């Protein structure tokens, strides 16, 4: 019981959860994130998932879907830079990407393949605007590997210190 209390306190001191009972636009979310940053100095923001954000009606009239996402992601980049925090944006794959499976004869034959950058809802804007792109993939229907997460590094902006993308077949 003491360990549980200690763990809860640790989590509360290191993480804040923004109420998920409200649907935010990216503008409202950044306003909330700024208010929290002013009160509590955090270093990272996770948006999970991006497609849970409502479209800002003012911007939606000006841009098509791709341009809208590009604009929002640019705003997130600026916020990240101005507030000196890392922002992680979780995305889901498009339906067609979920239908792509490993070929016959492959060790994962018939299992859904990991996403590529362009496979997320909103497409290439996410890969274009992000410094780094990581795909966390699980084969939940695999008889033995259902509990493992395969981490595919799809993009690394800064490679001078040794960072690099992982080979597609070797996450």
Q: Language-model segments: which ranges?
A:
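Cytosolic-facing regulatory segments adjacent to core modules
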Residues: 1-41, 166
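Helical hairpin unit composed of two closely spaced alpha helices linked by a short loop
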Residues: 43-79
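Active-site-proximal loop/turn and secondary-structure-junction residues that shape catalytic pockets
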Residues: 23, 51, 93-95
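Short coil/turn segments at beta-strand junctions that form active-site/ligand-binding loops
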Residues: 40-43, 85
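Flexible beta-alpha connector loops of hexameric P-loop NTPases
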Residues: 16-22, 55-68, 102-113
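Acidic, glycine-rich A-domain
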Residues: 28, 64-67, 122
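Conserved protein kinase catalytic core
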Residues: 25, 54-55, 98, 161
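Phosphate-binding/switch region of NTP-binding enzymes
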Residues: 72-171
